Amino acid sequence: PRRPMGAEHGADKHRVTWLEQQQAEAESLGSTAHLTVADGDEALALAVVEPTWTDFHVSYRVGARHPLTQGAAGKAIGLLEGDDAYAVTSGELQTGARGLAAPVRGVDGLRASVGIVTLDGSIDEDAVAPQVIAAAGEVGERLR
């Protein structure tokens, strides 16, 4: 039988903790938060948290896939070997959607990112990037 994605890193047991932490971020930013892992040449949404108070927000399912070369989540995974701290994209996966994601570093064999996506087309990078980078760092710490 196929093991759940990320099982070799204990991702399932930490997913609940991540979801609780990211619910607060999703609420404060009014944006959807996600934990994404690489599966071959695709980005796979492992966990998604949506804000509860917004009239409109980006919604997508756990298990959704897209090419690693598109979207902030996939592009952030591509930053694992570089010095850049995060990736920002606009309209690459859905017209009007803008994302910001940071790679999860320091876990051997894991290619993953943590990020947010919003519909309003603007992200205050100075405010949001440090939160997302910190969240990605926490995921890495918990999985080491």
Where are these regions (language model features)?
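Arg/Lys-rich, alpha-helical DNA-contact motif
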Residues: 1
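Amphipathic alpha-helical effector-binding/dimerization core
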Residues: 4-81
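Short beta-strand segments
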Residues: 36, 103, 117
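Conserved GNAT-family N-acetyltransferase fold
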Residues: 47, 102, 114
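Active-site donor-binding loop signature of nucleotide-sugar glycosyltransferases
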Residues: 48, 106, 118
